[in-house]
Amino acid sequence: MTATLEHTNFTVRDPKATAAWMRDVFGWKTRWEGAAIAGGYTVHVGSTHTYLALYAPENPRPAGESSYDTVGGLNHVGVLVDDLDATEAKVRAAGFKPHNHADYEPGRRFYFDDDNGIEFEVVAYD
């Protein structure tokens, strides 16, 4: 049996704006968007086989404690890219600040936080 991650669902301030920078930075496409089942609005953005569901509720609550200290918290999203340097330039152009650069076997990585407070790890393997 093979299991593959198909999607994850995140609460964001503005799904359309978040999807826009993800399309620009990662080259993804919008697969679907519309009214969410529980109210609010959702955009699905990603590749042919995997995506992120970006959800904005009608009445959002502010973020709580650090996700690294909260059971069930999202710590970061890892995205594999072919060209780390080109992706970092796109991250900067989108207005985000890369940090925690590191080389490790078998590749290189950096992190950035988006305007929703979600941390992304961008990695390229040698």
Residue ranges and their predicted role:
Residues 9-11, 78-82:
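Short hydrophobic/aromatic beta-strand micro-patches
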Residues 2, 9-52, 93:
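Core segments of cupin and vicinal oxygen chelate
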Residues 53-55, 121:
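Conserved beta-strand in the GNAT
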Residues 21, 85-90:
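Short amphipathic alpha-helices within nucleic acid-binding modules
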Residues 39, 73, 106:
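Exposed loop/turn and edge beta-strand positions of beta-sandwich/beta-sheet ligand-binding modules
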